Amino acid sequence: MDRQEVASRTALLGLKAVDEALTDFVSRSGKADGLKQLRCAFLSGTSVGGMDLSEVFWQEHRDDLAGGDARSLSMHTPGDVTSMMAHYLESRGVNIVFSTTISTACSAAGNAIMLGSKMLREGLCDVAIVGGTDSLCRFTMNGFNSLRILDPEICRPFDESRAGLNLGEGAGYLVLTADSEGAVCRLTGWGNANEAY
């Protein structure tokens, strides 16, 4: 990561999670050097990208037109987060042959896992690093609040008196391969539907 580059909270959460996934994969499979030869796809799901930094910039710039660190806008879009993370993986010796961002709200990380599985099955990559990252920001909180679906109480999804959802932030990544060497689990299937009209 360039010293002049500004990292959003979404990117920082993602970098930590992808580093843990990669470290675990290397220790289980023993393929530290092999990652340079393997064709790796990086598929990352996120919705807000670097919106947290954009919000800070907007507030500073609104109050003083000369204010605000414009570098923070370099992390605004979801793709900027993925790009930063892909560069980090390359600095760790990972041979990234394909990288993309999936921004489908709550299903983004699941869609990244499905796409990575399909790419492995079609022989488009040898390893797929898949998952997602998102941080809380005013944009997300206000968006869900405007829908009037936030519950002010703790999460209770199966309770008859439930009154909405609770928002959180986090990141999680997996390393998928076609072989079972060092595998922790097996992905046996997936499903995806768009039930809107």
Question: Could you describe each region identified by the protein language model?
Answer:
Residues 1-44, 50-51:
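Conserved active-site "lid/cap" helical segment
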Residues 15-26, 78, 82, 86-89, ...:
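Active-site-proximal alpha-helical scaffold in enzymes
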Residues 32-36, 91-95, 120-122, 148-151, ...:
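Solvent-exposed alpha-helices and their adjacent loops that cap or buttress functional pockets
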Residues 43-101:
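Active-site-proximal gating segment of KS-fold condensing enzymes and close homologs
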Residues 43-46, 103, 128-134, 176, ...:
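Short beta-strand segments
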Residues 52-53, 135-157, 191-197:
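Active-site-adjacent elements of ketosynthase-type condensing enzymes
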Residues 55-67, 119-122, 142-153:
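A glycine- and small-aliphatic-rich helix-loop capping segment at beta-alpha/alpha-beta transitions
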Residues 154-197:
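Condensing-enzyme catalytic core mediating Claisen C-C bond formation in acyl metabolism
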